């Protein structure tokens, strides 16, 4: 007999498969999150049933022993760390061995620095590859932040750099970023900016004992 995947409000056990699916969807969606309509469409249920699944999952995450939460922000649902654990996340960022950034993270950061505010889709169009992981890394290290929402379908998140970004690279203002040629296309932007940040990161690494 085929296992029932949809949610019945009067049967708590049937909610388990749907909760697991929603959790996986939100994890895969990352910072962009998913709307109620998107979740309902994937589960093949109406929005009221999808909302019940989300509420059940939110209740699970509200327990003290859970380190993440399910938030609703600007009409979309997404997973995020709890604020009470911010001090531990800061320790992770400052821990020895955590200072170096991957090539993918440097590329993504360079694009954001020069093109902010910018959406994930625009970043991926320039890089030519998915950028979920680099964005998560940069967010975790507080080098970038959400600065708003773009107009249009889904109102995607806009990313920009932070004060920590300036501190990390020893800059006082964004004006200290080296100017790019006016004719630079997206490929040239990525190459030039990436070289600059890679060199800065190497210098910072050499200065550390």
Swiss-Prot record:
Transmembrane stretches, start-end: none
Cellular localization per UniProt: Cytoplasm
Keyword line: Cell cycle, Cell division, Chromosome partition, Cytoplasm
Coiled coil start-end: none
Cellular component per GO, a single term: cytoplasm
GO biological process entries: cell division; chromosome separation; DNA replication
Pfam family, one: SMC_ScpB
Principal cellular location given in the protein's record: cytoplasm
Known role: Participates in chromosomal partition during cell division. May act via the formation of a condensin-like complex containing Smc and ScpA that pull DNA away from mid-cell into both cell halves.
Similarity annotation: Belongs to the ScpB family.
NCBIfam families named in the record: SMC-Scp complex subunit ScpB
Subunit and partners: Homodimer. Homodimerization may be required to stabilize the binding of ScpA to the Smc head domains. Component of a cohesin-like complex composed of ScpA, ScpB and the Smc homodimer, in which ScpA and ScpB bind to the head domain of Smc. The presence of the three proteins is required for the association of the complex with DNA.
Protein name: Segregation and condensation protein B
Species this chain originates from: Geobacillus thermodenitrificans (strain NG80-2)
